[in-house]
Amino acid sequence: MSAVMLDVEGLDAWYGRARILFGVSLKIGRGEVVALLGRNGAGKTTTLRALMALVPERAGRVAFEGREISRLPTHEIVRAGLGYVPEDRRVFTELTVAENLEVGRRPPRPGTARWTQDNLFRLFPNLAEMRERTGGRMSGGEQQMLTIARTLMGQPLLVLLDEPSEGLAPKIVEEMAHAILAMKKAGLSVLVCEQNLHFAKAISDRAYIIEGGRIRYEGTIAQLEAQPEIRDAYLAV
């Protein structure tokens, strides 16, 4: 693993009196794509929401680029360099594609790749063809691409993706994998929550498996491939 960008130790999270995460610890290196795998209800989404300070109560240590961010509000976490793409996409349905992208625009960070509408349209050619279409007239896959592109307009250093392949046609999933690998090539780090092991294998350097709000496994994709008993125990439907 390259130099650590995100270092999470002992992350706990609650919704009311219900505890959802139990001491989640993980690391992500610069320019690395890491998968957080698990079934529905395992704690994947809550992990991302806890990292973004979007859960009612949390505890533990979260360091980003060597800076403690555990106590920061969400907008300060975004300003520090984390971008979040939720599962429900949240496009602005009355705005055009171009207008949605402008909503997310932030100044570039020194020494990092600069994301503009032009290079995002090259990354997602379908969006270029519908730049004047409103978000409400787009398919689920098109909305997913738009949400990722809008997040990149915020010039993040690390992108958190929640189930980016869920419910999408195979061709769109393939385009999504290509986009994530292009993000990595541009120097971004990515933490992607997934149930689709095939998709995760195509894009990830390493993987964690979460079950019952606890990390049960960590290793490279090759190591996970060599341990079918792990896949059967935690990922089989």
Per-segment meaning from a language model:
Residues 60-68, 80, 113-117:
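Conserved ABC transporter NBD signature motif
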Residues 37-39:
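The feature captures the beta-strand-to-loop junction immediately N-terminal to the Walker
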Residues 16, 72, 97-115, 123-128, ...:
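ABC-type ATPase nucleotide-binding domains, specifically the catalytic core motifs of the NBD
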Residues 159-163:
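Catalytic Walker B motif of ABC-type/P-loop ATPase nucleotide-binding domains
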Residues 52:
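Helix-to-loop junction immediately C-terminal to a conserved catalytic motif
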Residues 151-152:
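ABC ATPase C-loop
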